[in-house]
Each structure stands twice: as C-alpha cells, then as structure tokens.
Amino acid sequence: MDESNSQFEKRKRDHIRIALDPRSQTDGQNGLDSITLIHEALPDLNFKEVDISTSFFFSGESIPLSSPIFISSMTAGHEKGREINEALARLSDRRQILMGVGSQRRELEDSNAAEEWARVRKQAPKARLLGNIGIAQLIKSPIDKIRRLIDSTEAVALFVHLNPLQEALQPEGTTDFKNGLAAIENLVKLAGVPVIVKETGCGFSVDTLKRLSSTGIYGVDVSGKGGTHWGRVEGYRSEESDMLYHVAQTFANWGISTKQSMLNAIDARVEYQLWASGGVRNGLEIGKLMALGASKVGVAKPFLEAALQGDEALEKLLTQLETELKVTMFCTGSRNLKDLQSKKVIQ
C-alpha cells in the first residue's frame, strides 16, 4: 500500500512514541540473565590497561572504533527523527562508534528525504554511519537506487533489515518477501560496501543463519527478542476495536531471544561476523554477548531516550556502558576484546 508523506511521518512519529512506552518492551526476555561470567579474583592486569577499542575492517580498510558498542537503528525520515539522528551522529563523530540509521525506505521515492543526511553530515562529518533498507524494499528496488541510499549517508556499510512480523501487523506493511535471499546475494555483489543482515527484535533460527551463509554477507546482527518488540509497537498503533490490535496481542511475545539467537549462530557454524542486539541495557550484557562471540553489540532504546534529552545525556550513557564493559573485562581477567571473546568465561 502506498502512503503519502504525511502518513509516513505520522507512522514514524507513532513508532517513537510507542517504542518509549513500557508496553512495547519484552524486558527480561533477552535470555542474558541466565548467563554467568566466571569471576577472576586475581586478574593479572591493571584496570587502566583494559582496552575496549576495536575496528571495522573491510577490503583492506580499517576504521578505528573506540568500543564495540554501536547505536542500533531506530528512526529516520521525519522532523523529530532528524533531530534524534543529528544528536546520535554527533555522538558517533565525537566518540568514534558505529551508528545504524533508521530505515531509508522513504528515500527510494522521495529524493528530498536524502537531504536529512546532508544536514546530519554537516554536524557530524566523521560519524561512522550504517545505512539501512528493508528486505521488502530491496527485493523490489533497482540496485542503483540502493547505492544512492548508501551514497546519501556516506555509509561504511548497509544494514538489510528483516521484519516479517512487523510488516504483517502493520496496516501499511509490505509483506512480499519472496526471492529475498537472491536479492541479498545480488546486493552483496554490487553494493560496494559490506552488507549486514539484521532482524528487528525477533532473532534468527539456525536454518536462516545457515541459508544466509551462501550470500557472501559481511555479517548478521541477530537482533533477538528482549527489547523493543515491533509487533507490539504496530499493535498499539491500532485502536482496541481493530482486528490487528488483537492479532498483535497474540504475537506479543513472538520471537527468538537474543541469547538463543547467538547460540543458534554457534550451532550454525557461520563464517560471517556476528553482531548482537535486542534488549541490551548495560555493559555487563554487552560483555556477555561478546563472550558468546559477538564482535559488535548494539543498543537502541537507551540511546533513543538519551538523544531526546541531549548531547550530555548521550555522553553520560555511553561512558557508563563503556565503563561497565571495562569492569566486566577486568573481573574476568580480559585485557582486551579478543581475550573476552576467546576465554571460557561462560558458566
């Protein structure tokens, strides 16, 4: 179903409003509470030596990053979203972390929408941005249009998000996912930047992770259940008298947890990079996911909340997350991220 610009902007405003509503959250369902990291009472290192720096490496180019934490995709394509993205991009610029932008779907049909990123880039010329398009749009769009999305953000990589539940529950949803695997494979060949496939809060099965191995993608962000549930978000956009409201209630806890999605990736023995997100709320959870094999870990809702408060709140949040990660590493005897990923720290 086609929608006007005003309808699109209202939908995106609804998404922000409802994503901040506790009813949209599957708190406590990411599975990470059941993981215990082994405490090291006598770490052979100085806390000041703990190093959380990393990089984004592709085709011989290495982009330095201050930490493995990335800002997970939330919103784009409307005035409030622009303000949020400007604040997040400034943080990415200042602190050298990756930032996933919200869906760039609108830019496929509205060339003026790309101006949002030109304004963002003026404020944050060194922001490390990750472009973002949905699989349903990728399937139907010529590759030159997708490349324009990448160019508009000057993205270092492109997320392709998979969101079947959200699309099925969205009145304006696009639910034709046929030939999606072939579309991803074609994109990998022609995009010119790394392609990372992500879910949007419902996670991945072993089978899907194995199927993606044939496409040549750079990585997968498992984006499991445990945080903002976009099925719930779409349900709460509907009136209680609407059928879709009640259908969404049926699927309010649908999905594979973040922890289980990571375990599924281990079982699938994938060779592409594993990133993780989905209900991540603190640096200890980031450490747990790194120990499970994640090379980057995304945080969404906390960054959205902080962005609405301003730059100082964003700085405080990121500093806290990074400090919690460092404490996790110190107390497991991990000098750097490689140590954390390679040690048997899971009990």
Swiss-Prot record:
GO MF annotation: an example: isopentenyl-diphosphate delta-isomerase activity
Membrane-spanning segments: none
Compartmental location: Cytoplasm
Name of the coding gene: fni
Keyword Glycoprotein set for record: no
Catalytic activity: isopentenyl diphosphate = dimethylallyl diphosphate
InterPro entries found in the cross-reference section: Aldolase_TIM (IPR013785), FMN-dep_DH (IPR000262), IPdP_isomerase (IPR011179)
Subunit structure: Homooctamer. Dimer of tetramers.
Keywords, comma-separated and alphabetical: Cytoplasm, Flavoprotein, FMN, Isomerase, Isoprene biosynthesis, Magnesium, Metal-binding, NADP
Protein name stated in the entry: Isopentenyl-diphosphate delta-isomerase
Residues involved in Mg(2+) binding: E167
Region (Disordered): 1-31
Organism: Bdellovibrio bacteriovorus (strain ATCC 15356 / DSM 50701 / NCIMB 9529 / HD100)
GO cellular component term of the entry, any: cytoplasm
GO biological process, one term: isoprenoid biosynthetic process
Enzyme Commission (EC) number: 5.3.3.2
UniProt family annotation: Belongs to the IPP isomerase type 2 family.
